[in-house]
Amino acid sequence: LVQEKGSPSLKKIAIIGASYLQNPLILKAKELGFETHVFAWQCGDVGERTADYFYPISIVEKDLILAKCKEIGIDGVCSIGSDLANIVVSYVATSMGLVSNTIEATRLSTDKHAMREAFERNGDPSPKSRVVDKEFTLSDSDLRFPIIVKPADRSGSRGITKLDTV
């Protein structure tokens, strides 16, 4: 069964993000017969060209994305490879009554400090962690070298620095 783009019976999926990380998802969704509606900052990423429809809306603009998804009448929303995108996925899906992780589960999986606190509360093994600011001094903590500094709001290895000395 082949359905034409724009067909009312074609399932419409919103994909948050258009980079090389999301492109395999875009391509697989199209292969499975979904009409792809991709949202991202317009910067020449591959998904801008491979999506059926591309909307140059930054993924931090969750209310604008929600409004457009309602207008389109999407059937689902997803992403891959981006913690920031997952926040928007949960927000849009929850707001539209679609299947998704809860907003709280998404918060715990995207805020690394909140995640570590949840691990500690539940007795799950996890590296020691501390929230630090410019006033932090190593002598006031029980942390020892090497120390890994990681932004609380970045996925994978983005923003990681290893410190071996002061």
What annotation goes with each model-predicted range?
Residues 1-105, 121, 139:
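ATP-binding N-terminal substructure of ATP-dependent carboxylate-amine bond-forming enzymes
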Residues 111-166:
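Active-site nucleotide/adenylate-binding loops and adjacent lid/helix of ATP-dependent enzymes
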